[in-house]
Amino acid sequence: MTSTPVSPVVLVILDGWGYQENSDGNAIATANTPIIDSLWTAYPSTFIQTSGKAVGLPAGQMGNSEVGHLNLGAGRTVPQELVRIADAIEDGSLATNPALDKVCKQVSQASTKLHLIGLCSKGGVHAHSDHLLALLKLAKEHNISQVCIHAILDGRDTPPKSAKDEILRLQKQIAHIGVGQIVTLSGRYFAMDRDRRWDRIQQAYDVMVNDQVAVPRDWSPLDAITDAYDHKTTDEFLPPTRIAPGAIEAGDGVIFFNFRPDRARQLTQAFVDPKFDGFEREQVKPLHFVTFTQYDSDLPTDVAFKPQNLDNILGEIVANHGLKQLRLAETEKYAHVTYFFNGGIEDPLPGEDRILVPSPMVSTYDQDPPMSAAKVTEEAIAALDKRIYSLMVINYANTDMVGHTGMMDATIQAVETVDGCLGKLLNQVINVGGTLLITADHGNAERMWDETGNPWTAHTTNPVPFILVEGEGRKIPAHGTDVQLRADGRLADIAPTILDILQLPKPEEMTGSTLIQAAGFEVRQNKSPVRIHR
C-alpha cells in the first residue's frame, strides 16, 4: 500500500540576506537577482525584524544566525544569553552563580591560576567584553592573584581593525580593578573554528598551554596587534601569540566566557574531552573548566548559565502529529537548522531527517563564493521528489559567509549563486504542489562597507524579506488568491505561519502570530467565496 504523496511547506533561509534602500555598497541590490525580484513582485511579500528586542536581544543589537534560527524554530521571542548574563551582572546574581563561585573558590584555596578565555568584543554575537570585566571583578572579590586572560580578537562581528581600542579599554580596567593580565592573543579564525579545521584550533591550544613559546622582551598586546596590521593581517586572522607567562596547567581553573556554543565547542573539546582526536596533545588534568553556556551536553564541564527549556517548538509539533520533516544545510550552517532550530536539542526529533553537505575547504569563502549551494539544491530537489516530507528547512550560507569577508565582488557572486539555486528549487516545489517560504535570519550582505568606505564584515540591524509562494497542493485555507501578509512581523511569527499553512494547532507557548492576515472573505458550504464587508 503506497502512502499519499505529500505537498510540503519548504522554508528557505537565505543566511545574511538583509534589505536596505541604499544601493551603495549593497551586494544584494547590486547583484543580478531575477528570481527573487520576480517572486517579491508576484507573490505576497513583506519585511520582518531580526534584531534587537524582536529576537530577545538588547535594543539596537544586531541579530545573528544562532538567535535567528532559535526564534524561527521556537515561534516565540527567546530571551538571549546576552541579555540573561547582562541581567545577572546588573542584579548581582553573577557573584553567586554556583558554577562560577565554585571554580573561583577552588582556585583561591589552592592558590592556582584562573584563566579567562573568550572573544574580547563588543559585537555581542559570541561574547561581550563587559562580561570579561565582570569576571575580573569576581576574581578580585575572591582574592585570586593570578588571573590570565587568553584574549580572542574579533574583526568579524566588529570592524576588522577594532582590537586596539578593545585591548586598551581592557588594560585600563585591569589597572583599575587591580587583577588580570593578558597572556595570549589569537584571532577568532584560529581559536573559534567550527568546521573541524583542527590545525587552526591546535595553534590556539598550543599557545595557551605552552609557556615555552619565545616572547620578545617588552612585547605587549598592542605590539602584537600593530605587528599584525603592518603585515596586512586584521584582527580575525591574528596568529595565536604568547604575550606573557601564564600557561594553562594541571590544577588551574578555566572560564570560557563565550555564550554562543558553535564556535567555542572545538577548543573546549581539546581541553576536556578524554576521547579527543582532533590532533595529538597531552590532556591538561585535573582542570576545573567552566563554560558560560552549555556548548555540548556531552562535554564534561560545569555550566554557568544552563539551557532554557523550550517546549512545543515547531519541530516538536510537526513530529507529534506524525509528520516527517527534513533539515538541510552545508557544514557552516548545519548546526543552525538542527541544534538551534530545535531549541538546543542535539538529537533529531521523531520523523526528522538531516542532510549535511560539506562546505568547501578554503581559508576564506571569498575564494569560493558558490560554496556548496549547488549540492544543497541538488539534495533538496531529490528530497522533494520523495514526496514524504511535510516540512523542509533549508539554509543557504553564501550571503552570510562570503559577506563576512568584506569582499564586494565575491559577495555579489554569492548572491547571484543563491538566486540561481532558488530558481531551480522553486521549479521543483511547484512541481510537487508545495508552498515555498523564503526569508533570512539576519542582514549582512546588503552592507559591505561603512560610512568611511572601509569593509564592513559584521551583521546589520536591517529587516529581511519574507516571501510566500503558495502551492496548488498546499493551499492556505479560506484565502483563495487573496493572501495578505502583516507588515509588523518578526522571526518568531514564521513558525505560527507554517503551522497555519499545515493546518496544525498553535500551542500556547508560541507567542508569535501568523503573518497571514485574516481573509477578507469566507468559504460557504457551496465552496463559493463570499466577500466580508468590514
Swiss-Prot record:
Keywords: Glycolysis, Isomerase, Manganese, Metal-binding. Substrate binds at residues 126, 156-157, 188, 194, 260-263, 333. Monomer. Pathway: Carbohydrate degradation; glycolysis; pyruvate from D-glyceraldehyde 3-phosphate: step 3/5. Binds 2 manganese ions per subunit. It catalyses: (2R)-2-phosphoglycerate = (2R)-3-phosphoglycerate. GO terms for biological process: glucose catabolic process; glycolytic process. It is an enzyme of class 5 (isomerase). Its cofactor is Mn(2+). Catalyzes the interconversion of 2-phosphoglycerate and 3-phosphoglycerate. CDD domains: iPGM. It holds the Pfam family iPGM_N. The active site is at 65 (phosphoserine intermediate). It comes from Acaryochloris marina (strain MBIC 11017). InterPro entries: Alkaline_phosphatase_core_sf, BPG-indep_PGM_N, Metalloenzyme, PGAM_B_sf, Pgm_bpd_ind. Mn(2+) 1 binds at residues 400, 404, 459. GO terms for cellular component: cytosol. GO terms for molecular function: manganese ion binding; phosphoglycerate mutase activity. Its EC number is 5.4.2.12. Signal peptide: none annotated. Belongs to the BPG-independent phosphoglycerate mutase family. Mn(2+) 2 binds at residues 15, 65, 441-442. This is 2,3-bisphosphoglycerate-independent phosphoglycerate mutase.
